[in-house]
């Protein structure tokens, strides 16, 4: 396993504040229906911790008042709209689809902000298909996280692999011929019978990897847009209850959440989507502007804004974004991403057909890659949102 970074995990990266409080710089949430993630944690003895709040239930602020009943009715209207749209959900934008809803303005504003935040792009640049995750969101769930940090499964798997993992070893060249695969890194040359490219989409379509892809596979991968987002961490100075609030003006949500039976994790976390909002809030510089906005959104919380921090991914050379999205009018032939191409197989969350953008998608892609190379190994289980 050749890893360019000095750590395993990629966009699953658990870190700590100076007082030891866990923060998640990347992936964070687990859903009960994510069967492969739940099963993997169970096999590795890694506990899931209930948060006392729902990843799906975010109280909208900043727009027209809207009730829980109105939001529930809006989601029902979305489901009806999807049944009507069919394949047209790939042709029109999220913005256009929301305007078709006969719902209160507050509902439509909340839905647009939610999807722009989660999908990491403006609503005009997202195919209406992205609304499906909101339409199918479960009601009143207590969302779980990995109690010891989102990268715990990665660290556990890395411990099993031991010295077979090579850290800080970026690939600079690679080739495939009749004799196998040759990979040149900054440190050594490696040869193998097959290769699995487990890379984010922006990286796999760049050299030296792009030249290895069949033309139609490169075209399929290139069809996806790249999403951008940032995370915020602000230590809590006082007490708080688990909560989730969506700022509908600025495409971000913030939450306070339990760490299972240990009680509240003493930090307010946030997630902001779409590059225009990241630029507006200057998140690449620091978290000051964002933290000031949070003070208006959550005046009820006592927060240590001087210690606020952010994490961005668009400026990370090994990520260049958070995940992918489908643009209006584009219908990526993504089935090609889940097939074996001679000695080459792709992996990575963006290749999954159900859980793209989630740790579940990454796990499923790895299982699929292993099964494609060795059919005696099980493929991932059937999945649904």
Which stretches of residues belong to each language-model region?
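Generic structural signal for small/hydrophobic residues in well-ordered secondary structure
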Residues: 9, 41, 98, 157, ...
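Active-site/ligand-binding neighborhood in enzyme catalytic cores
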Residues: 83-170, 176-180, 198-209, 325-326
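Central helical "cap/lid" subdomain
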Residues: 175-176, 185-243
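Glycine-rich FAD pyrophosphate-binding loop
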Residues: 1-18
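Catalytic cores of eukaryotic secretory-pathway lumenal/extracellular enzymes that build
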Residues: 14, 18-20, 27-37, 197, ...
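Dinucleotide-binding Rossmann-like beta1-alpha1 core, especially the glycine-rich loop
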Residues: 21-87
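A short alpha-helix-loop-beta-strand transition element characteristic
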Residues: 37-58, 88, 102-112, 241-247, ...
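Conserved flavin/dinucleotide-binding core of flavoenzymes
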Residues: 180, 190, 229, 250-385
């Amino acid at each position: 396993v050749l890893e360019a970074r000095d750590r395993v995990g990629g966009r699953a990266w658990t870190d700590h504040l100076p007082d030891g409080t866990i923060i998640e710089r990347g992936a964070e949430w687990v859903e009960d229906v994510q069967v492969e993630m739940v099963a993997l944690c169970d096999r590795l003895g890694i506990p899931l911790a209930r948060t006392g709040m729902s990843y799906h239930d975010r109280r909208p602020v900043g727009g027209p008042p809207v009730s829980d009943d109105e939001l529930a009715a809006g989601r029902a209207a979305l489901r009806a709209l999807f049944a009507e749209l069919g394949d047209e959900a790939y042709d029109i934008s999220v913005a256009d689809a929301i305007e078709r809803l006969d719902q209160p303005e507050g509902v439509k504003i909340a839905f647009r902000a939610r999807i722009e935040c989660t999908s990491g792009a403006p609503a005009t640049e997202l195919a209406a298909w992205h609304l499906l995750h909101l339409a199918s969101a479960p009601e009143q769930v207590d969302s779980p996280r990995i109690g010891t940090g989102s990268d715990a499964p990665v660290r556990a798997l890395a411990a099993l692999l031991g010295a077979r993992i090579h850290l800080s070893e970026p690939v600079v060249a690679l080739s495939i011929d009749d004799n196998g695969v040759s990979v040149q890194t900054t440190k050594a040359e490696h040869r193998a019978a097959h290769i699995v490219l487990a890379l984010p989409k922006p990286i796999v379509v760049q050299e030296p990897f792009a030249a290895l892809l069949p033309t139609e596979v490169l075209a399929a991968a290139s069809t996806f847009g790249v999403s951008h987002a940032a995370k915020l961490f602000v230590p809590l100075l006082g007490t708080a209850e688990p909560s989730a609030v969506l700022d509908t003006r600025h495409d971000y949500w913030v939450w306070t959440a339990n760490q299972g039976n240990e009680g509240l994790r003493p930090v307010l976390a946030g997630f902001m989507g779409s590059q225009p909002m990241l630029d507006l809030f200057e998140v690449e510089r620091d978290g000051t502007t964002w933290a000031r906005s949070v003070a208006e959104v959550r005046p009820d919380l006592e927060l240590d804004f001087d210690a606020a921090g952010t994490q961005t991914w668009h400026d990370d050379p090994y990520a260049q974004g958070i995940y992918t999205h489908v643009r209006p009018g584009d219908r990526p032939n993504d089935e090609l991403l889940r097939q074996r191409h001679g000695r080459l197989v792709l992996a990575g969350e963006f290749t999954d057909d159900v859980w793209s953008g989630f740790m579940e998608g990454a796990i499923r892609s790895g299982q699929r890659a292993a099964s494609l190379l060795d059919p005696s190994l099980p493929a991932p289980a059937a999945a649904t949102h």
